[in-house]
C-alpha cells in the first residue's frame, strides 16, 4: 500500500467527540481558529502525496475503513487546511463537498497519538 496522507492527532477539542454520535469525525491542523478547534480533532499537518478518491483505505489507529465517496473540495481542504469531515456511513456519493465517507463503525478509542492515514490499496 502507498501512503497518500499521514498525520498524528495531537489534541482533541472539548466538543469534538460530540460529533462521533452523529457518525462524524472532524479534523483540523494545529493552529486552527479557537472557535473551530473546540469541535475538531487537531493534528500535526502532513503532506498530501496524492489524490483523495473513492477506493482508498482510511485508517485511524488499528481501525481500517474503505473509502466509497469523496466530496469535491475534501482534497483541497485537507491539503490547505488539514481539515476533513469523515462520515462513518458508507455512502457511495458524497453528501457534502468537504466530506469523505468511510464504511465501518465509529471508533471509540481515539486519543492524542492516534495515527490517521489515507492509503492507496493498489500498488
Question: What kind of feature is each model-predicted range?
Answer:
Residues 63-64, 71-76:
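Short, conserved beta-turn/loop elements at beta-strand boundaries and strand-helix junctions
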Residues 47-53, 58-59, 110:
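Short, well-ordered loop/turn sites that connect or cap secondary structure elements
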Residues 1-23:
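N-terminal, charge-rich interaction modules
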Residues 54-62, 116-119:
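Short conserved beta-strand and strand-loop elements enriched in small hydrophobics
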Residues 26, 90-123:
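Helix-rich interaction surfaces within compact, conserved domain-sized segments
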Residues 36-47, 93-102:
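Short, structured beta-strand/loop micro-motifs enriched in basic residues and often containing a Trp
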Residues 74-85:
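Short, solvent-exposed secondary-structure boundary/capping segments
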Residues 32, 47, 63-66, 120-123:
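Short, charged beta-turn/beta-strand-edge "cap" motif at the junction between a beta-strand
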Amino acid at each position: 500500500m502507498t501512503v497518500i496522507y499521514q498525520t498524528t492527532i495531537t489534541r482533541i477539542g472539548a466538543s469534538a467527540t460530540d460529533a462521533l454520535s452523529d457518525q462524524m469525525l472532524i479534523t483540523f491542523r494545529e493552529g486552527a481558529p479557537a472557535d473551530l478547534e473546540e469541535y475538531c480533532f487537531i493534528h500535526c499537518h502532513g503532506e498530501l502525496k496524492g489524490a483523495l478518491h473513492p477506493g482508498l483505505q482510511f485508517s485511524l489507529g488499528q481501525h481500517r475503513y474503505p473509502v466509497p465517496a469523496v466530496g469535491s473540495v475534501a482534497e483541497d481542504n485537507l491539503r490547505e487546511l488539514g481539515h476533513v469531515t469523515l462520515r462513518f456511513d458508507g455512502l457511495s456519493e458524497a453528501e457534502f463537498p468537504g466530506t469523505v465517507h468511510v464504511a465501518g463503525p465509529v471508533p471509540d478509542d481515539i486519543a492524542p497519538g492516534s495515527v490517521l492515514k489515507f492509503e492507496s490499496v493498489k500498488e
